[in-house]
C-alpha cells in the first residue's frame, strides 16, 4: 500500500484552487477550436467528477467513473469549481485509513460500444493512485489550454511528480529551468 495516497491528491486539488483564482470565468469557459472541443472548465469538471464519484462510491464499494455530470456550474464557473475542489479535498481527508485497502468494483463503458460496460476489481488506495495520475494528465492539458490563451499556469501544474523529480535531479540543467521555472 502507498504510504499516503490521499495527500498527493489533496495537494493537486489545492494546486487547482490556486490556479482557478487566477482565471476569469470567460478564460475558464473559452474553447480554442484549433486545439480541442473542451474548455479548461470541461477538463476541470471531468477531474472533479472523478473525485466526486470515487468518494460517493467508496462506502458501497462500487465506483462508476462514467456517471459524470456535464454542463454544470463546475464546468462554467471558477468559483463553483474551486468550491467543488475544496469539497473533494475535505472528503479525501475524511477517508479513514482503514478504508484505503478496501476492495472496490470499478465500472466504465467499454470501448466505443454503446451499452457495453466493463468492471474490474480494485482497491481504494489503487484508485487514489489512478486519480492522481488522471488529474496530473488533465492538468497538463489545462496548462496547454491556458498557455494558448496567453496565461501562465503554476510551475508544477500538470507536471508528473516523477518528471519534477527527474528535472530537479539534473541540477544546473537547462531543462529544469524550462519546465519548472514557468509560472
Predicted regions and their residues:
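Short, extreme N-terminal leader segments that mark the start of a protein/domain
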Residues: 1-5, 9
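Alpha-helical transition-metal enzyme core signature, strongest for iron centers
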Residues: 9-16, 40-54, 78-92, 131-142
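Helix-loop segments that flank and shape redox-cofactor active sites
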Residues: 15-39, 55-73, 115-121
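A generic secondary-structure signal for well-formed alpha-helical elements
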Residues: 20, 51, 146-149
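Short, helix-capping/interhelical loops that line the mouth of catalytic, cofactor-
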Residues: 49-94, 98-116, 151-183
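Short conserved catalytic/interaction loops centered on acidic-Pro-aromatic/His motifs
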Residues: 139-157
Amino acid at each position: 500500500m502507498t504510504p499516503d495516497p490521499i495527500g498527493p491528491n489533496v495537494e493537486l486539488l489545492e494546486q487547482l484552487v490556486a490556479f482557478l483564482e487566477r482565471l476569469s470565468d470567460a478564460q475558464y469557459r473559452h474553447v480554442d477550436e484549433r486545439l480541442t472541443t473542451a474548455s479548461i472548465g470541461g477538463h476541470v469538471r471531468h477531474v472533479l467528477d472523478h473525485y466526486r464519484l470515487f468518494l460517493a462510491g467508496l462506502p458501497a464499494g462500487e465506483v462508476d467513473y462514467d456517471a459524470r455530470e456535464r454542463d454544470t456550474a463546475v464546468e462554467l464557473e471558477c468559483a463553483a469549481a474551486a468550491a467543488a475542489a475544496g469539497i473533494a479535498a475535505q472528503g479525501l481527508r475524511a477517508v479513514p485509513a482503514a478504508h484505503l485497502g478496501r476492495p472496490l468494483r470499478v465500472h466504465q463503458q467499454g470501448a466505443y460500444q454503446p451499452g457495453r460496460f466493463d468492471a474490474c476489481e480494485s482497491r481504494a488506495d489503487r484508485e487514489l493512485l489512478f486519480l492522481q495520475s488522471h488529474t496530473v494528465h488533465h492538468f497538463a492539458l489545462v496548462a496547454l489550454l491556458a498557455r494558448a490563451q496567453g496565461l501562465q499556469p503554476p510551475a508544477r501544474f500538470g507536471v508528473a511528480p516523477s518528471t519534477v523529480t527527474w528535472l530537479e535531479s539534473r541540477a544546473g540543467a537547462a531543462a529544469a529551468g524550462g519546465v519548472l521555472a514557468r509560472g
